[in-house]
Curated annotation (Swiss-Prot):
SUPFAM superfamilies xrefs: SNARE fusion complex
Name this polypeptide is given: Protein transport protein SFT1
Record-linked InterPro entries: BET1_SNARE, T_SNARE_dom
Organism from which the protein derives: Saccharomyces cerevisiae (strain ATCC 204508 / S288c) (Baker's yeast)
Complexes and interactors: Component of a SNARE complex consisting of SED5, GOS1, YKT6 and SFT1.
Length: 97
């Protein structure tokens, strides 16, 4: 009878050990997936950082060019403003008549 009890206990232990091994394999797979996603997300974040840095540099360069052009051509801006004013006056006159 002790042999039968021993074999039942061994059988129970084997089933529990197999269940634990399956859970451990599942956790290892989950851990691997998390690691893969972290690497992928890190790559995406690095690409976004590079893109934002490039965009910031482009905006800074455009801003400095705009500032230089505004300082250099005051008479051009006056002519553009005068042309717009004349356009709106003529538009309003034609709209009324």
């Amino acid at each position: 009878m002790s042999n039968s009890r021993y074999s039942q206990t061994e059988s129970n232990n084997d089933r529990k050990l197999e269940g634990l091994a399956n859970k451990l394999a599942t956790f290892r797979n989950i851990n691997q997936e998390i690691g893969d996603r972290a690497v992928s997300d890190s790559s995406v974040i690095n690409q976004m950082t590079d893109s934002l840095g490039s965009m910031f540099t482009d905006i800074k360069n455009s801003s400095s060019r705009l500032t230089r052009s505004l300082k250099a051509g005051n008479s051009i801006w006056r002519m553009v403003g005068l042309a717009l004013l004349i356009f709106f006056i003529l538009y309003t006159l034609f709209k009324l008549f």
